[in-house]
């Protein structure tokens, strides 16, 4: 069978289903693929058990089960992630294994918001999922219109509590199961949901359009030409003649100009996100730049040493710690290309953190590093990974 060509004319977005266990996330995922396929003939209709039997994957040493499906609407192509278990969501969102540009929060109209509904909203906030659309599921089981309105209000209030615009978030009432069974009245609700997703979740800015940033992996000097920093461009573009800043691990940022860009020993006019390059820097000595710093467009990223983070602590089975840790624990924080020692302060009322838990924490690094909200990191101890986290707020 010939492979279908990937259609680049449509914009692309990554989304996922979130919400409490048994509220219908996987059934909704199956219904979306089935209803959209039935209408356009594009994509693949997936059955519930095809999605539910997601294989385990290992991402940065952490075991996660995730189902990836794809489908398209009139205007967009979507990659959609659905996880079978609650722990899989926690790990997925924190490690960024499945980046989400937006999420569909599934709430059973028969039950209303439940503990994991709240936890997934909080996680979305902390890991930087920017937009949420709500699907009130199982509406075929609720006859009372007032009850539906009550549940909708509860969900909106809950979203507002975590700084999502609860009053403006689209809420679609439907039944994933009825739509999956081919009931036209409920299929229409799936189209209504996808219209809301198309309109409310903006097309993400592509990495190449963002301001330039490259983590430095290695540094060497070329006699007579100067110092070269190598690494993979994380975002944006850089061209010969651009001014860049060297950020992190030093008292102050240093500005320099890129006088050459090389890839695979060939000279380039410019490089963009995803390219592995060597950048020749004007007037920078070998001692003034090191692995773990970043090169960035001036003024776009600043070095910090204190932040709040959402962290998943690896279980013993995943090769993590065998014992809990307490406040003032001092492991290594691995950002992009380097380890920096940091001190952990646990939130009030949290005595200790057990392997396999997730927690919020305050971190104070012993030196500044280029970080921003949404930057991912690993926590390591003696070279092995014991945790995975994401910066939720910069505090200093």
From Swiss-Prot:
Annotated region described as G4, given as residue ranges: 137-140
Family that this chain belongs to: Belongs to the TRAFAC class translation factor GTPase superfamily. Classic translation factor GTPase family. EF-Tu/EF-1A subfamily.
Gene Ontology MF: a single term: GTPase activity
HAMAP family the UniProt entry points to: EF_Tu_B
Entry EC number(s): 3.6.5.3
Subunit architecture: Monomer. Interacts with BrxC.
Chief place of localization: cytoplasm
UniProt name for this protein: Elongation factor Tu
Disulfide partners: none
Keyword DNA damage set for record: no
Organism classification: Bacteria, Bacillati, Bacillota, Bacilli, Bacillales
Localisation per UniProt entry: Cytoplasm
Species of origin: Bacillus subtilis (strain 168)
Pfam family, one: GTP_EFTU_D2
Region (G2): 61-65
GO cellular component, one term: cytoplasm
